[in-house]
């Protein structure tokens, strides 16, 4: 059983390698028209910035969306358009970027997301895709977190020990 092949998601999606470019275009178009504060610093490293999108009127709270990418790829700029749904329902949306493995441990990324959440208006709803789903699930017990919705999270990390990617994950 080739574990690297099992975790190569894009290879099994028709035209999957083109998706990131499409996501980036959609996200950039959304940012161009959104009521937002972009690249708000929450920590000392260059990647510790977040985009904060504001709804019309007083927000009901904040949805925090954490991007995926197996802890080694992507940043907030690919996902801005996903803020549209919560914004339409009166929620602020915060999307943090974070340092990537192998420069940091996964536990440090979790701490960075926790730091990004400090000072956000609650109640907080956390969501994230893939590795982002894993990260928000780790934060489910934090104060002021009312709901957590991991989307297709990497929930069992044990199989990753058998991948080449494991050399970068710490």
Could you say what each language-model-derived stretch is?
Residues 1-28, 138, 147-152:
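N-terminal presequences and immediately downstream first alpha-helices
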Residues 10-57:
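N-terminal cap/lid segment of alpha/beta-hydrolase-fold proteins
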Residues 56-85:
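Short, surface-exposed "cap/lid" segments of acyl-processing enzymes
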Residues 65-68, 95, 127:
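Structural cue for short, hydrophobic secondary-structure segments
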Residues 74-83, 94-123:
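Catalytic nucleophile-loop/oxyanion-hole region of alpha/beta-hydrolase
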Residues 126-128, 151:
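Short beta-strand immediately N-terminal to the catalytic nucleophile in serine-hydrolase-like folds
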Residues 128-138:
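Glycine-rich nucleophile elbow surrounding the catalytic serine of serine-hydrolase chemistry
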Residues 138-170:
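Hydrolase active-site cap/lid region
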């Amino acid at each position: 059983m080739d574990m690297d092949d099992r975790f190569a998601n894009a290879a099994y999606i028709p035209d999957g390698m083109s998706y990131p470019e499409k996501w980036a275009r959609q996200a950039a178009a959304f940012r161009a028209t959104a009521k937002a504060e972009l690249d708000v610093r929450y920590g000392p490293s260059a990647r510790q910035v977040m985009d904060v999108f504001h709804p019309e009127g007083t927000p009901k709270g904040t949805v925090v969306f954490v991007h995926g990418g197996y802890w080694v790829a992507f940043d907030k700029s690919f996902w801005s358009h996903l803020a549209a749904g919560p914004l339409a329902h009166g929620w602020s949306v915060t999307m943090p970027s974070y340092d990537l493995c192998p420069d940091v441990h996964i536990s440090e990324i979790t701490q960075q997301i926790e730091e990004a959440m400090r000072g956000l208006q609650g109640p907080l709803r956390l969501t994230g895709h893939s590795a982002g789903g894993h990260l928000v699930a780790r934060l489910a017990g934090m104060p002021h977190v009312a709901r957590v919705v991991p989307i297709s999270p990497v929930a069992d990390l044990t199989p990753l020990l058998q991948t080449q990617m494991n050399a970068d994950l710490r």
